[in-house]
């Protein structure tokens, strides 16, 4: 076992050494061709993103066609929309508790409310409303830090698919497992991105972890733990004048990411619609959605 481990470490070191050599050669070539500093910096950014987001076998393909067209429009747009809605409610009806909800937001047409489940848009629009400063900042930071590199690699359509799958999974799961609670925040979508990314990291652990860095990974895990802590607080330890908020979206979004998200993010250089894993994940997801719809119509305690 020790010999195998030594061989794996030696192979990893050789790969990293080869990549560094290729970087130096490419930068030298750009200088000779008059490519300029801007082009060299852009290429360096794409190389870093490829190491963090892709296994080694896919990095070359990405770097050959790497560009910022289209730019990461989806993640930036959804983040601006969430921030705009938060500012609107904070100014119109200032929140009395920075980590709970007030009556102004509880009456919002965006929030998921168990009494108004027939308004189907609420199963998606709840992602625009947040339960306080730390809630909006936590979600925005996580989805921008992870979502922008993901969208640079996989483009907006795929990232949007995973994000919205997590949002819908979050509200439907909450309607089943916590049927009498309100739901706000984009955590379902954020955790879907994280679930898909980290499944890809785990499957390609030996290739991606050295490039990504254990320290960065631990920071992200710490952020997740803190976010889950606040979610549990909002659910179980709210003040008397506050309203408990479900945290089921975090878990359901993570599972959506580990299924659909992993399949989407692991098919970087392949046709997604031709991958049987994608259709298996979609079929399982739709089965869960249909069950949730049936539950809400016929079995929910909120009826």
Curated annotation (Swiss-Prot):
Disordered: annotated segments: 20-39
Gene Ontology BP terms: proteolysis
GO molecular function: serine-type endopeptidase activity
Annotated keywords: Cell membrane, Hydrolase, Membrane, Protease, Serine protease, Transmembrane, Transmembrane helix
Top-level taxon in the UniProt lineage: Eukaryota
InterPro entries: Peptidase_S54_rhomboid_dom, Peptidase_S54_rhomboid_met, Rhomboid-like_sf, Rhomboid_IM_Serine_Proteases
Principal EC category: hydrolase
Name of one Pfam family that matches: Rhomboid
Catalytic center residues: 187 (nucleophile), 250
Outcome of mutating residue 185 to A: Abolishes protease activity
Compositionally skewed regions (Basic and acidic residues) per UniProt: 28-39
Transmembrane segments: 72-92, 128-148, 159-179, 183-203, 212-232, 245-265, 278-298
Post-translational modification comment from the UniProt entry: Proteolytic processing of the proenzyme produces a N-terminal fragment (NTF) and a C-terminal fragment (CTF). The processing is required for activation of the protease.
Function: Involved in regulated intramembrane proteolysis and the subsequent release of functional polypeptides from their membrane anchors. Known substrate: EFNB3.
Protein name: Rhomboid-related protein 2
Protein species of origin: Homo sapiens (Human)
Annotated gene: RHBDL2
């Amino acid at each position: 076992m020790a010999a195998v481990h030594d061989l794996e470490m030696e192979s990893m070191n050789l790969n990293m050494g080869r990549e560094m050599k290729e970087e130096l050669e490419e930068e030298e070539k750009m200088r000779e061709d008059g490519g300029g500093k801007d082009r060299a910096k852009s290429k360096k950014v794409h190389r870093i993103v490829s190491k963090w987001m892709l296994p080694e076998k896919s990095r070359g393909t990405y770097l050959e066609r790497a560009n910022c067209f289209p730019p990461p429009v989806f993640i930036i747009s959804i983040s601006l929309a969430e921030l705009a809605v938060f500012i609107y409610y904070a100014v119109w009806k200032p929140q009395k508790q920075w980590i709970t909800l007030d009556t102004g937001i509880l009456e919002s047409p965006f929030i998921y409310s168990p009494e108004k489940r027939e308004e189907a848009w609420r199963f998606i629009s709840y992602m625009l409303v947040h339960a306080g400063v730390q809630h909006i900042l936590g979600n925005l930071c996580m989805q921008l830090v992870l979502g922008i590199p993901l969208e640079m690699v996989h483009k907006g359509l795929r990232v949007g698919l995973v994000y919205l799958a997590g949002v819908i999974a979050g509200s439907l799961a909450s309607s089943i497992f916590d049927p009498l609670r309100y739901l706000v925040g984009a955590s379902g979508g954020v955790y879907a991105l994280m679930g898909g990314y980290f499944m890809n990291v785990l499957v390609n652990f030996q290739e991606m972890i050295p490039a990504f860095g254990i320290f960065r990974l631990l920071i992200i895990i710490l952020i997740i733990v803190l976010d889950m802590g606040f979610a549990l607080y909002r659910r179980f330890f709210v003040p008397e004048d506050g309203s408990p908020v479900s945290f089921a979206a975090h878990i359901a979004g993570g599972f959506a990411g580990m299924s659909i998200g992993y399949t989407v993010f692991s098919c970087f250089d392949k046709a997604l619609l031709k991958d049987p894993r994608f259709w298996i994940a979609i079929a399982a997801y739709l089965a869960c959605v249909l069950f949730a719809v049936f539950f809400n119509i016929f079995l929910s305690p909120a009826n």
